[in-house]
A protein has these predicted regions:
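Helical "lid/coupling" subdomains associated with nucleotide-phosphate turnover
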Residues: 5-192
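Acidic, divalent-metal-coordinating active-site segment for phosphoryl/phosphodiester hydrolysis
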Residues: 1-2
């Protein structure tokens, strides 16, 4: 899990990276570290609360470093790539099955993401398996991803969250292709 604070400097063509952090918790490591019984809803919610606290503690130093920049800037824009945010967006869109074209570029209200996270955190693995767009392979791990997202939203409240399915590498590649400044250079006729 990586977080990057980009500057909004009007004179720059490409946003400047002001600070970044690589958090020691991804969904797998957080899920495996924060173990416990999950027989009841209360036990599942307790585990979720502990996961959020662990992530928040890991982000505290970064939050402190970026606070001075955040104090005088416009409202925060968050962008999540792949994994949990795309799963939550697909649930928000009420898709019958995952559809990358519908999810990529979606803008989801942050309160909706939080509500879905809260709902999933109280469900059993079997209940989550039955939801479209989660399935067997993510049913156990998705709650850890929800805890990471909720901890981020606790520290940096935003009205909405942009969702990208294509990932950061594709964005970097498109940026490099478009480095000469020609708007169509990233792929003539493609959705930008």
């Amino acid at each position: 899990t990586e977080l990057v604070l980009l500057g909004d400097d009007p004179g720059l063509r490409v946003p400047a990276i002001r600070d970044w952090v690589s958090v020691p918790w991804g969904v797998v490591s957080l899920y495996e570290t924060c173990t416990g019984p999950e027989d009841t809803r209360e036990q599942r919610l307790d585990r979720y609360t502990r996961m959020r606290a662990m992530v928040a503690e890991s982000l505290a130093g970064f939050a402190g470093r970026v606070a001075p920049w955040r104090a005088h800037e416009r409202p925060l824009r968050l962008l999540g790539t792949s994994g949990t945010v795309t799963t939550l967006a697909s649930l928000h869109l009420d898709l019958p099955q995952y559809d990358r074209r519908a999810v990529d570029g979606a803008i989801v209200p942050a309160p909706a993401m939080r509500a879905i996270s809260e709902r999933l955190s109280g469900m059993s693995v079997a209940e989550r398996r039955g939801l479209p767009c989660i399935g067997r392979e993510r049913a156990d791990l998705v709650v850890a991803g929800c805890a990471i997202l909720d901890a981020i939203l606790d520290l940096w409240p935003a009205e909405r969250l942009g969702v990208a399915d294509r990932g950061i590498r594709e964005g970097i590649l498109r940026g490099l292709i478009n480095v000469d400044g020609r708007p169509g250079a990233a792929g003539e006729g493609e959705k930008q």
